[in-house]
């Protein structure tokens, strides 16, 4: 399901694959690089390596459980500014802190990214996500030191996309 190739210049590339085999893919690329570089063989550790955010115990009833171990860091954000505990819309379970977190730590750069991918709000309730977009844009603009023009552009772009999700 994946291939490791070496170009004439020695560039190692991996093609194909899927999320469920990323550990094997990593092993194959590292082993190929070690051989190409004349390095000693070393046993692969990816099988036992936890991915970022791993949490050994998950309470699926806890708000934000899907952030794993990062959920504690989001709670710390809230402890520094209680207003970040507020939800972004009454019909959505997401907090201001989750938006701020995504900008500061996940390279979230657009309102669409925040509402479609970081929170899935667009998929869960398109109408509510459209209504939440101005607040989300404002939070993001503050975090990124951007002004009203950016907010306006983001809202136009997001509304254009989000209206395709309305019934």
Functional labels for PLM-detected ranges:
Residues 1-167:
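Helix-rich C-terminal "cap"/substrate-channel and partner-interaction subdomain
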């Amino acid at each position: 399901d994946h291939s490791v190739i070496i170009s004439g210049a020695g560039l190692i590339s991996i093609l194909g694959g899927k999320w469920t085999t990323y550990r094997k893919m990593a092993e194959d690329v590292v082993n190929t690089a070690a051989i190409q570089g004349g390095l000693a063989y070393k046993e692969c550790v990816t099988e036992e390596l936890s991915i970022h955010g791993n949490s050994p115990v998950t309470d699926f009833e806890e708000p934000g459980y899907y952030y794993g171990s990062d959920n504690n860091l989001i709670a710390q954000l809230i402890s520094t500014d209680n207003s970040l505990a507020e939800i972004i819309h009454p019909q959505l379970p997401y907090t201001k802190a989750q938006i701020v977190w995504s900008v500061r730590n996940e390279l979230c750069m657009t309102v669409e990214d925040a509402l479609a991918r970081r929170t899935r709000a667009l998929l869960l309730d398109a109408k509510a996500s459209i209504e939440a977009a101005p607040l989300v844009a404002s939070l993001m603009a503050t975090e990124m030191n951007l002004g009203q023009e950016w907010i306006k552009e983001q809202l136009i772009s997001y509304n254009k996309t989000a209206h395709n999700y309305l019934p």
